[in-house]
């Protein structure tokens, strides 16, 4: 079985039926100034049972493309958000 990428982030939006938008933060070193800066990217993840809410911290695993922009499937919910 091939290695599957895993991403960890915060749910920022419920983007439709069985879909959530997750904001993933990564830290990179700036090429010129050598300072660690944060970079953010949003991914659409597939949530089969509609169990996530806005603010939850989740882990998603890479899968085959489920739609034009959706290539990750929900693996687990690490922490629930405060609402």
UniProtKB/Swiss-Prot annotation:
- Identify the SUPFAM superfamilies for this entry: Nucleic acid-binding proteins
Q: Which UniProt keywords apply?
A: Ribonucleoprotein, Ribosomal protein, RNA-binding, rRNA-binding
Q: Which GO terms describe its cellular component?
A: cytosolic small ribosomal subunit
Q: Which domain of life is it from?
A: Bacteria
Q: Which GO terms describe its molecular function?
A: rRNA binding; structural constituent of ribosome
Gene Ontology annotations of biological process type: translation
| RNA-binding keyword on record | yes
Stored InterPro entries:
NA-bd_OB-fold, Ribosomal_uS17, Ribosomal_uS17_bact/chlr, Ribosomal_uS17_CS
Assembly behavior: Part of the 30S ribosomal subunit.
> What PANTHER family has UniProt attached to this entry?
40S RIBOSOMAL PROTEIN S11 FAMILY MEMBER, SMALL RIBOSOMAL SUBUNIT PROTEIN US17M
Similarity section: Belongs to the universal ribosomal protein uS17 family.
User: What NCBIfam families does the entry give?
Assistant: PRK05610.1 (NF004123), uS17_bact (TIGR03635)
Its function?
A: One of the primary rRNA binding proteins, it binds specifically to the 5'-end of 16S ribosomal RNA.
Q: What is this protein called?
A: Small ribosomal subunit protein uS17
Tell me the gene name. rpsQ
């Amino acid at each position: 079985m091939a290695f599957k990428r895993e991403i960890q982030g915060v749910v920022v939006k419920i983007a439709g039926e069985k879909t959530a938008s997750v904001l993933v933060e990564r830290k990179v070193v700036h090429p010129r100034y050598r300072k660690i800066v944060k970079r953010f990217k949003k991914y659409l993840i597939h949530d089969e049972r509609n169990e996530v809410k806005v603010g939850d911290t989740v882990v998603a695993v890479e899968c085959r493309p489920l739609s034009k922009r959706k290539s990750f499937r929900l693996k687990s919910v690490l922490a629930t958000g405060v609402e």
